[in-house]
Amino acid sequence: MAKHIVELTDALSNKIAAGEVVERPASVVKELVENAIDAGSTVIDILVEEAGLNKITIIDNGSGIEEEDVAIAFLRHATSKIKNEADLFRVHTLGFRGEALPSIASVSHLTLETSTGETKGTTISLEGGKIIEQKSGHARKGTQIEVSQLFFNTPARLKYLKSLPTELGNITDILNRLALAHPDISFRFSHNGKPLLQTNGNGDLRQVIAAIYGVSIARKSIPVKAESLDFKISGYAVLPEVNRSNRNYISTIINGRFIKNFALVKAIQEGYHTLLPIGRFPIIVLQIEMDPIIVDVNVHPAKLEVRLSKEKELGQLISQMIKDAFHQLQLIPDGEVSKKQKEQQKSEQIQMSFEENRQPKEPPTLFSKPNIPEYVPSDEIVPKEDDFILETMPTYNPETQPEQVEEQKERIPKMYPIGQMHATYIFAQNENGLYIIDQHAAQERIKYEFYREKIGEVSRELQELLVPIVLEFPSDEYVRLEEQKAKLEEVGVFLENFGQNSFIIRAHPTWFPKDQEEEMLREIIDEALSAPSISIHKLREDTAIMMSCKKSIKANHYLTMQDMEALLDTLREASDPFTCPHGRPVIIQYSTYELEKMFKRVM
C-alpha cells in the first residue's frame, strides 16, 4: 500500500533547514554576525564559550527589531531584506532567505533582546524553536542574541563535530573573513573571556590585515586596484616572498560577502605565476564591487559560492592587476638573520608610523630598507596607527603613464661578482650590500623569457633535419596527438602521419638548441600528452618552463669571473629577474646595514 504524502510540521521543517544552515557553531556565528552587519552595526561583540558549544553571544548596535516583528522573525522565510522576486536578483544584504533565526532556534536555547532605541525593547526566549516567553526588555538600541545548548535535541549532530580547538578555529576563520570584508565595522571577539580579535572599524583594510595576520605581513603588503565597466577591485597583495602552503589566505570578497570561487583563485594564482614556488600560495585580500544583477548569491546553503555572469573578464582583470603591480617593484628578498639576532632586535623599542599618503620623490621600491630594527608586537590586540610603518607602495592603475613605466624598467642594480660558493651560488656586491645569486635559477629565468617569446612568435623559419625523426606511439596516445596537432604546430612541432600509429618530423624551428633537437621534440610531445586537455597558452607556458630548466647550467658547475659577469648582466635585462619560472628566488640581498649590525658595527 502506498504511503500517504503529508505536509511536514514547521518544527520539523526548521530542523531539516538547520541541517544545511547550521552545521556547526561557526555556522551560528556567521549567520548572526551577518544579521548584525545587515542591521547597520558599527560595533559587533562576539562572546563564545567552549568553542560555541556552551554559549554564543552576539551584541550589536544596529537598527534593532520592532516589538511586533520579534516573534515573526522566527517564522521560516520571514525577512525584511527582500519583498519580491525582483529583489532576489539584486541582493544588497548578506542574508535574505529568512532561514537563519528559525533554524538556529530549532536546535538550541535562544534568547534575543532587541530595541530600535525609540521605545522600550523586547526580550524573547525560545527552546527548540518554541517560544517560551516574550516580555519587555532594555531600551538600548541594537540586538543581543544568546545561543546556548546548541544541538541539544539533535545529538547525532554533536557526534560529527570536531575537537574544541578545531571548532574554535572555524569560528575564528569566519570572523577573520567578515572583518576583512568590513573594515568599517569594529569586531571584538573573545573566547572564554580571552580576547582573540579586535579591529577598530576605521575603514583601513591594512590595519585589519595587521590585526589578523600580524604587522609583519601587513608591512609586506602592497595596495592593488583595478577598474572596468563592470568591476571595481581594491585590496592588498602580500609580496611573493611571504607565502603559505594552502589557499586559506586567499580572500575574495564580492559586494561585502566573502565567497569561494575556484576561477577567481586560479586568476589570482595566475597573477603570481613564476613568482611563487610550486605548492605555495599567496596571501591576498581583494574587495570586488559589481552590480548585483551580474552575481547570483542564491546557489549555496551558506551563500559561500556564487555564480558570476562575467567570470572570465573578472579573472583576467585580477590577473593583470597583480602582474602589473609586482612588475613595478624590486622583489629581492632580504637575507634571513639568525634567531639570536631576531631576539636581540625584538628587545629594542621603536616608534613607527603609517606613511600611506606620503608620495616618495623617487619611484618606490622594496629594495631599500629603513635603518630601523624589526617591529616588536605589543600585548595589545589592535595595532594602532603609530605602532608600525609601511613603506609606500605603488597602487596598480591601468592608466599608468608610459614615462613612469620606463623609469622603472631596470629592476635590479648593477652587481659585481666576487666569487662562487660550492659551484652553485654567485656572490656579488655593490654599494647597497651583498648579493647571493642561484646560478641555475638565474639562467633558468633568462632562458624561460627567451623561449617564451620564441614559442609565442609561431615563426615558420624551419631547419630541415638531415635524418627525419619517426616516432611511434600506443594507439591511445596517437589519437590524442592527432587531436593536438594544431596546438603542437603552435610551439614548433610539425607532425606528419607516417604509417600506423606513427608520425614523422622533417623540420624544427631554427631556435631549437643545436644537437638537442630530437630530445626537445620528444619533451614537448610528452608535455602535450601529460594532460587530457591542454590549451595552447598552457602548452606554450609548460614548454618554455621545461626547456629553460633542462637547458640551464646546474649546481656544481664552476664559472669563470667572465661567465658570472655575463650572467648577471643578462639577468638585469630580464623582465622579471627575481624568481625562476617555478617561483624559487633567484637573488637574495644582505644590505650593508644588516651586515654591519650582525658584526656589531652599529647598534
Curated annotation (Swiss-Prot):
Keywords: DNA damage, DNA repair. Disulfide bonds: none annotated. Gene3D superfamilies: 3.30.230.10, Histidine kinase-like ATPase, C-terminal domain, MutL, C-terminal domain, dimerisation subdomain, MutL, C-terminal domain, regulatory subdomain. GO terms for molecular function: ATP binding; ATP hydrolysis activity; ATP-dependent DNA damage sensor activity; mismatched DNA binding. Pfam families: DNA_mis_repair (PF01119), HATPase_c_3 (PF13589), MutL_C (PF08676). It comes from the Bacteria. GO terms for cellular component: mismatch repair complex. InterPro entries: DNA_mismatch_repair_CS (IPR014762), DNA_mismatch_repair_MutL (IPR020667), DNA_mismatch_S5_2-like (IPR013507), HATPase_C_sf (IPR036890), MutL/Mlh/PMS (IPR002099), MutL/Mlh/Pms-like (IPR038973), MutL_C (IPR014790), MutL_C_dimsub (IPR042120). One of its GO terms (biological process) is mismatch repair. Residues 336-372 are annotated as: Disordered. Residues 336-346 have a biased composition (Basic and acidic residues). This protein is involved in the repair of mismatches in DNA. It is required for dam-dependent methyl-directed DNA mismatch repair. May act as a 'molecular matchmaker', a protein that promotes the formation of a stable complex between two or more DNA-binding proteins in an ATP-dependent manner without itself being part of a final effector complex. NCBIfam families: mutl. Belongs to the DNA mismatch repair MutL/HexB family. This is DNA mismatch repair protein MutL. It comes from Listeria innocua serovar 6a (strain ATCC BAA-680 / CLIP 11262).
